[in-house]
Amino acid sequence: VPQTLTKSPGLAHARFSWRLRKGLTDRAITLLIEHSRSKKKLGQPEKWAKQRQIMVRELMGRKKYRQAYSLASTHHLDKGAQFATLEWLSGFIALRRLKQPDLAIRHFTKLKNTVETPISLGRAGYWLGRAHSASGDKASAKIAYTFAAQHQSSFYGLLAAEKVGIRFDKTLAGREQFPNWVNASFTKKSVFSASLLLLTAEQPDLAERFLTHLSESLDPNALGQLGTLLAELRDPHLQVMVGKRAAQHGNIIAAPYYALHPLINTPHPVAAELMLAIARRESEFNPTLVSGAGARGLMQILPGTAKETAKEIKIKYNVKRLLTDWKYNATIGGAYLAKLSRRFGGNPVLIAAAYNAGPSRAKAWIKKQGDPRKKSVDVIDWIEMIPYAETRNYIMRVTESLPIYRARLGRQVLPVSFSKELTGAGLLPLSQ
């Protein structure tokens, strides 16, 4: 290597990546810490950010919290998803592991001032409230929690509302009335006309692209009108996709965002809100979806799991029907959920963890981190310490959907507080 390039950030990153590939994790961490002393030494901080998160989690798993904080907080980013994640990690470690709430407040404040989506705003406000509370500043904690509680479509927004006694947001029941969509201004746009032509031509995937693009330019009232149209078309998948795109731009229109699916018209062995929450998260109600891992259909059932479950409930197994018959898929998915519910005592956190990552991993996390159903274990910390980002996110998205779907179904929204639901046994099979 030429002398002029020995201090190149690009060369350092290549060395870092090589060490990781060779399993030299400690040496990779040492190199990352050394180059995190300045933005100049990193060159392009964003290139290091994803592996930085992984290394921080690695150190947290080893209980090397000071080193983990140092690595998380010296990211030298100023915006974006990686910035938000690393600022949150810095604040979490400072608050929950180093017991330094004032330090945590700095990170959670930066997070709150940077993020935009309801999920992230709820998260930032809740943790800022926790940090202020730990520092003894009850007034500031209440302000932060109240801010987060504006976003009750999110996991942390629900928890924050509970902290300050704010009632469930009734708009999430999805009963808002909007003017007739026929007279909506967006019906005159070419992108809308194209989407209808594509739906008529049985090209729903292409129609989805046009409709989600259209939704980005609509105000909440027009989004509600578009949601009403999609409900009339009886396409819950398109409803969810438009609802999610709107949410990414800060607009929560509950009816499409938490669309109902006709699966609720058929009896299942578990609560309807659990079926809806899982199906929405798994496939976004797309009955023909096949994942990279081979999971199929509405409930994203793996063929092996489906075959075993079909045998247990004494129905004929047909792998093709997992994609061609959503009712068949839901029957098997519901039976599998009931099995997980019995295994994990009706606890929504463990059911979701097991459905996403497998029951053996859920049991392993109980063994390593404690049982989240017990008072001695902080269930929020338990979720946040799961090593897989996908599973952490999955648990939050499923559990936050439960009270909202109960509201959509006209049922009692919170039979117990949301925090108690997370540790409780409220989702036992209906036969029990």
Regions found by a protein language model. Give the residues of each.
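Residue at a conserved register position within TPR or TPR-like alpha-solenoid repeats
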Residues: 19, 59, 94-95, 132, ...
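Solenoidal tandem-repeat scaffolds enriched in leucines and small polar residues
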Residues: 1-48, 54
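TPR repeat positional signature
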Residues: 12-15, 52, 87, 125, ...
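TPR-adjacent "capping" and linker segments in tetratricopeptide-repeat scaffold/adaptor proteins
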Residues: 2-7, 40-50, 79-80, 176-189
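Outer-membrane beta-barrel initiation region
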Residues: 154-169, 177-204, 208-209
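Alpha-helical segment of the N-proximal tetratricopeptide repeat
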Residues: 14-22, 54-62, 189-206, 210-213
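Catalytic glycan-binding domains that act on GlcNAc-containing polysaccharides
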Residues: 27, 39-48, 55, 62-88, ...
